[in-house]
């Protein structure tokens, strides 16, 4: 195995996180927040994974571009990511869309979200730029990708996942040679090209790019001058470099961080209600696919000060209990029973209620005798006494956002419309 350099390249890199997207496939879950600000795993927000990867990789200069409904995201970062110190040559910049180029122009694409802050990037004088999406769940050491970028002499190095070929139709797909040099980049192809050594698999873009800073800024300026550009990395910047420069694929398996319990590289988009529910519920397994308890690669986040979780009542039909579940601080399970559920902070589950396959966001109150199965309940929802979800598909679909696989998203406006 190749060893890391004695002098890490991450020390001379800046991570630039694109966190302005809505995530419309999450429906009402992103009505009040951007997708990167959506809660995940009982404690964190989705963006904490990209930020933690950067920090754990040794990167100490980070910029985060925000746009859509950014208040909760900005507040979270101000509270949880305020420990960077300029006197140690560290920085953490929150970069909201602010019409820095013209009085009528917000961020018009992923590339434009970087271009509009070129002066800030130049001020830091870093050698390398690591462009990241702020809405994926994974653990990755970017130092390995930086090292491959330098060793290969590439103009851009693109993080890629190996996925079954016919599942790659929703991704940007790399056609590579046996050296993983990218010959073509195809956006959402009907017939994805296979990998030379694994023809039944394709290399799908993770939306992670490494550049030498000067090359990137020159490419952004050239793109900004093109009136036909959509100002997007995947649609404009990357295809141009593939055709006119040298682009190299970096396989995620080479830099994925895995504990002793994680056997396969883990990366999730969690961009749909089903995917979001499944990724959270997976954490309740005895040996989950994603190890969030790995102290060698912590997921940093805002550490809210809360009292411990509490379980009360021990009668035959009224026992506060949880099996195969994750329960966060400040939760009180008062005579309720949980199975295969994940609760964020401040949840109150009252007597005789039963939760199974439930993802409960912070500060939810669950009334007595509620029966909730396969649900995602948004922040602060008050579940009325006796509400039953998960038994009558037709009724659930009328009341809530129900997916084809039977997962129900419940928000307070939906509850307010109930006639019960």
UniProtKB/Swiss-Prot annotation:
It is an enzyme of class 2 (transferase). Its EC number is 2.7.7.27. The keyword ATP-binding applies. It catalyses: alpha-D-glucose 1-phosphate + ATP + H(+) = ADP-alpha-D-glucose + diphosphate. InterPro entries: ADP-Glc_PPase, ADP_Glu_pyroP_CS, GlgC_bac, GlmU/GlgC-like_hexapep, NTP_transferase_dom, Nucleotide-diphossugar_trans, Trimer_LpxA-like_sf. Pathway: Glycan biosynthesis; glycogen biosynthesis. Keywords: ATP-binding, Carbohydrate metabolism, Glycogen biosynthesis, Glycogen metabolism, Nucleotide-binding, Nucleotidyltransferase, Transferase. Signal peptide: none annotated. CDD domains: ADP_Glucose_PP, LbH_G1P_AT_C. Alpha-D-glucose 1-phosphate binds at residues 107, 172, 187-188, 205. GO terms for biological process: glycogen biosynthetic process. GO terms for molecular function: ATP binding; glucose-1-phosphate adenylyltransferase activity. Homotetramer. HAMAP family: GlgC. Involved in the biosynthesis of ADP-glucose, a building block required for the elongation reactions to produce glycogen. Catalyzes the reaction between ATP and alpha-D-glucose 1-phosphate (G1P) to produce pyrophosphate and ADP-Glc. Belongs to the bacterial/plant glucose-1-phosphate adenylyltransferase family. This is Glucose-1-phosphate adenylyltransferase.
């Amino acid at each position: 195995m190749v060893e890391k350099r004695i002098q890490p390249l991450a020390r001379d890199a800046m991570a630039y996180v694109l966190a302005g997207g809505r995530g419309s496939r999450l429906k009402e879950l992103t009505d009040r927040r951007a997708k990167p600000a959506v809660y995940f795993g009982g404690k964190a927000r989705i963006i904490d994974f990209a930020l933690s990867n950067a920090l754990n990789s040794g990167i100490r200069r980070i910029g985060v571009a925000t746009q859509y409904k950014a208040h909760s995201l900005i507040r979270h970062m101000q509270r949880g990511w305020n420990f960077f110190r300029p006197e140690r040559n560290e920085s953490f910049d929150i970069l909201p869309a602010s019409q820095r180029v013209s009085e009528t122009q917000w961020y018009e694409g992923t590339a434009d979200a970087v271009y509009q802050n070129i002066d800030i990037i130049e001020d830091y004088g870093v050698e390398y730029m690591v462009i990241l999406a702020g809405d994926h769940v994974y653990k990755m050491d970017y130092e390995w990708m930086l090292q491959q970028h330098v060793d290969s002499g590439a103009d851009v190095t693109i993080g890629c996942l190996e996925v079954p070929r016919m599942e790659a139709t929703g991704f940007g797909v790399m056609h590579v040679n046996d050296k993983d040099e990218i010959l073509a980049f195809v956006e959402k192809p009907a017939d994805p090209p296979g990998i030379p050594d694994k023809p039944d698999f394709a290399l799908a873009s993770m939306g992670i790019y490494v550049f030498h800073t000067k090359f990137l800024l020159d490419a952004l300026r050239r793109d900004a001058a093109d009136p036909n550009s959509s100002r997007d990395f995947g649609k404009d910047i990357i295809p141009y470099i593939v055709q006119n420069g040298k682009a190299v694929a970096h396989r995620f398996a080479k830099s994925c961080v895995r504990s002793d319990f994680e056997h396969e590289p883990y990366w999730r988009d969690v961009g749909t209600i089903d995917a979001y529910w499944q990724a959270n519920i997976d954490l309740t397994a005895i040996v989950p696919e994603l190890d969030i308890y790995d102290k060698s690669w912590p997921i940093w986040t805002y550490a809210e000060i809360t009292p411990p979780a509490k379980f009360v009542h021990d009668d035959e039909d009224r026992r506060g209990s949880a099996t195969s579940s994750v329960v966060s601080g400040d939760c009180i399970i008062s005579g309720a029973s949980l199975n295969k559920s994940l609760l964020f902070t401040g949840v109150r589950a009252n007597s005789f209620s039963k939760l199974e396959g439930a993802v409960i966001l912070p500060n939810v109150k669950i009334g007595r005798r509620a029966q909730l199965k396969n649900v995602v309940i948004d922040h602060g929802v008050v579940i009325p006494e006796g509400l039953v979800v998960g038994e009558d598909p037709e009724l659930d679909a009328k009341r809530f956002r129900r997916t084809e696989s039977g997962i129900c998203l419940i928000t307070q406006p939906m509850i307010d419309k109930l006639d019960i």
